[in-house]
Amino acid sequence: GYVSNILHDRIEIGDTIEVAPPCGEFFLDVSEKHDRPLVLLAAGVGITPINSILLTSLDAFPERDIILVHAVLNEDVQAFRSSFDALAQKNKNLKVYYRYSETPFISATNASNGFVTAEYLESILPGRDADYYFCGPQPFMVALYHGLMQWGIPASQVHFEFFGPRQELERAA
């Protein structure tokens, strides 16, 4: 991104830089009690903050049911797959699914071709009442936000990281 390019292009070893703590609002609040399942949805590099939320939840709420869906072009560009598979083996309350938009061959039983849509989620979720966290490219975000709003999911159960003003996402949906 913008800051990464500046760091690589202008900062030298030994330089001092001033940083501030993270200012984001996309995190799992571990001070609250969580009775509903946690649904984590990511496309592409949107998996990075979702991975952090997953690890936080497994640590803070080891009995909570978690469904993780990661959408990417194909298996070759999928980050964290071996980690997610290992976590699912270790945590029976964690279900992991992969969606590939460009792969004709899929080697895993928990993987399928297509996009992450409300219809797809309906086929894998035990029910709609859950806490939803999602991050990814704009078309992914718009489709999920629109689908969750159509389902009548309360805003308090919908959490996302959108790279742009929230109003843009709401207008697009």
Pin down the residues of each PLM region.
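FAD-binding FR-type
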Residues: 1-40, 53-59, 73-74, 85, ...
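Polyanionic, low-complexity intrinsically disordered segments
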Residues: 43-44
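Classical protein tyrosine phosphatase
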Residues: 56-59, 63, 152-154
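Reductase modules of NAD(P)H-dependent flavoproteins
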Residues: 66-173
